[in-house]
């Protein structure tokens, strides 16, 4: 069974972008932890990062289809900067029926204060 881990815009900069806010853990470190945890649970994981909203939507659509076919459990998604602005991502998640857990590295609403 598969799980998608989806990272939004600028998360490729983890580890060196504002380390006082986001820490020094890199995106590669996060993906390695996800892969190791998935393996322990007997799951497959695909980690994908994009700075482009359309690419994120395409992944959600693809995994929505896999979920309907019984091949994917769902997704863990950090939409990054798109958290407060993307109606299209919301519609993609809602429209596909893909179970999605939204996660964040900081308290949303406070990161840009």
Kindly label every feature range from the protein language model.
Residues 44-54:
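Short beta->alpha junction loops
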Residues 84-98:
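Short Gly/Thr/Asp-enriched flexible loops that form oxyanion-binding sites at enzyme active sites
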Residues 20-39:
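Short catalytic helix/loop segments, enriched in acidic residues and glycine
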Residues 9-11, 80-83, 106-108:
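Short glycine-rich anion-binding loops that position phosphate/pyrophosphate groups of nucleotides
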Residues 63-75:
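Short acidic/histidine-rich motifs immediately flanking catalytic phosphotransfer sites
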Residues 1-4:
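Extreme N-terminal starter segment of soluble prokaryotic enzymes
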Residues 111-113:
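Conserved small/polar residues in nucleotide/adenosyl-binding loops
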Residues 55-59:
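Short acidic active-site motifs
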């Amino acid at each position: 069974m598969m799980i998608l881990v989806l990272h939004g815009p600028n998360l490729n900069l983890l580890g060196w972008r504002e380390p006082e806010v986001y820490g020094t853990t890199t995106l590669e470190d996060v993906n390695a932890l996800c892969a190791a945890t998935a393996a322990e649970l007997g799951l497959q994981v695909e980690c994908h990062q994009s700075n482009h909203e359309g690419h994120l939507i395409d992944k959600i659509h693809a995994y929505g289809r896999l979920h309907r076919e019984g091949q994917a459990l769902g997704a863990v998604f950090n939409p990054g900067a798109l958290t407060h602005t993307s109606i299209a991502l919301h519609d993609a998640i809602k429209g596909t029926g893909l179970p999605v857990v939204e996660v964040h590295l900081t308290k949303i609403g406070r990161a840009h204060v």
